[in-house]
Amino acid sequence: MLLMENKAVENINIELPEILVTPSELKKEIPLSNTARSTLADGRKAIENILERKDHRIFVVVGPCSIHDLKAAHEYAAKLKELAEKVSDTILIVMRVYFEKPRTTTGWKGLINDPFMNDSFKITDGLRIGR
C-alpha cells in the first residue's frame, strides 16, 4: 500500500483569511437615512402600481452597469433626477447600479471586490462604500 504524502489541497491560493462584515453589522454601522428609506419605499410602490396597471406610466431602468468613481456616480444620479422630474408624468426612471462585474473574467471585478482598483481586494471596504 502506498502512503499518501500530506499535501495541501484546500485554500492553496489564499494569502490571508479575512472575516467579512455581515449584512446586519453593516446595516447597524451605516443605517439608511429616513430620506433613503422613503425613496426606496416610494419607488417600489410606484413600480408595483405600474406593473399592476394602477399607474399609466412606463418605467425605464437605466445604468450605469457598474461604478468605480463615486463622485461621477453622484453627478450622474443628480442629472438623472433632473430628467426624471421632467418626464415624471409619463415615465418613471429607475437608476440601477451594480457593484460587481459578474461576467468579467479578466481585469477589474467591481467596486465591492476591489474598491481601490489596485488588486488589494479590500472587500469589507467595498461593502461599506457600496452601502
Give names to the regions the model predicted.
Residues 39-57, 68, 72-86:
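Generic N-terminal targeting/processing segments that precede catalytic cores or assembly contacts
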Residues 78-131:
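A generic, well-ordered mixed alpha/beta core segment in the N-terminal half of proteins
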Residues 10-54:
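N- or domain-start disorder-to-order transition segments that initiate the globular core
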Residues 63:
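Conserved, mostly hydrophobic/aromatic
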Residues 1-12:
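N-terminal catalytic cores of peptidoglycan-degrading enzymes
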Residues 18, 32-39, 68, 72, ...:
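Catalytic cores of large soluble enzymes that bind and process phosphate-bearing ligands
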